[in-house]
Amino acid sequence: MIRSILFFVLTALLTCGTAQAQGKGFGLGIIVDDPTGISTKLWTGKSTAFDAEVAWSYDQDEFLYLHGDFLFHNLHLSKEVKGKFLTYYGIGGRVEFADSNKVGLRIPLGINYIFPKSPLDVFFEIVPLLDLVPETESDLNVAIGIRFVFGKGSSE
């Protein structure tokens, strides 16, 4: 299993496209999924970024949820679309602190639209999950979100 994950990460690193997707900036916004929380994204290169989510609840079912992913983006150009339309994939992890703590792997697959001359981006993703602690089980998350991007060039 570890070899398969390592192979996936190395293959993704070696085949990552060089198209300039965003390349800079830090995004902060909201992600609507299970659980809904605060979404961040930090661009680390022309087509790579780290993203993270933090979510919490203090109702009857108290929990704290954290995830982090390393993402690879591919730029798709269209004459009909003025902004940047990106697909992305990645690998990451998640931790859920609740009655039953969970630790697992994430493989996000998504689309991202970066508005032209605007500091906003929106995204939709489907994420296969593999929890490893306290027991091995799989799941699937679906999310949508919006972020305000700080440090994005005004000409984009």
Predicted feature residues:
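Bacterial N-terminal signal peptides
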Residues: 7-16
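Short loop/turn motifs that connect adjacent beta-strands in outer-membrane beta-barrel proteins
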Residues: 20-25, 47, 75-86, 116-120, ...
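Positively charged n-region of N-terminal signal peptides that target proteins for export
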Residues: 1-5
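Predominantly the C-terminal beta-signal and adjacent terminal strand-loop region
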Residues: 63, 116-156
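Mid-chain, well-packed structural core segment of small domains
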Residues: 80-122
